[in-house]
Amino acid sequence: MTCLMIDIEGLGLIDSDIERIKHPLVGGIILFARNCQDRSQLIKLIISIRKIKQDLLIAVDHEGGRVQRFKDEFTNIPKMSIFGKIYQTDKKLANKIAKLSGWVIAEELAAIDI
């Protein structure tokens, strides 16, 4: 079965968001900076989404630098090109910090059920 990933417009769910989430072809939601005021609000939003459809994939494009949608109360991850520059002179160090950065991102997102 094919599933759709949708987005929502604001900081909370409105009736039209709820109806779209309930649609059987919706399998995921991608969140953006516009959906995050602070960590507490974001957690409430995720809880409200999970109440509608528990097994929904909730995603975010959050890899560091300007591609870090959630900023306040999240670790500031440098842009990935920094790791590439380090890699040119010290491959082992670059791999280590890239892996650690990935773990930080994963832990912070998992902590809020993403």
Name every feature range the model reports, one short phrase each.
Residues M1-I14:
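Boundary/entry segment of secreted carbohydrate-active catalytic domains
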Residues L13-G27:
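N-terminal glycine-rich anion-binding loops that anchor highly charged ligand groups
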Residues L25-I114:
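Enzymes and membrane/adaptor proteins characterized by extended Gly/Ser/Thr/Asp/Glu-rich
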